[in-house]
Amino acid sequence: MSYSVLPELYRETAVRLADALDGGGYFSGSVRFAFGGMECRLTASVIVCRRRESLPEGDVDAVADLVPVWWEFHTADGEGEVANDFSFSEMKAYL
């Protein structure tokens, strides 16, 4: 059985990863969370490319792209790990 990753899960993963980036140019770590009865974990090492954006509140360094060096996305239910069809490039569209 394979768990189909829905747009809502990609969005949730992107939000949690963006929060974990913490303004740096490189991220290596994991984000874990529950979603729809599944325990999810993204473990990744990524290079963070940023661009300067001028906003009325001031300038910010927004994420322009993430270049994955290595990543794994795990989903598990009460019976153990469940294979999934996660795509890092699809998740990036939600950043």
At which residue positions do the language-model features occur?
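Acidic, low-complexity intrinsically disordered segments
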Residues: S2-Y26, S30, S54-L95
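Beta-strand elements of well-folded, non-transmembrane domains
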Residues: V31-E39, A44-R52, T75-D77
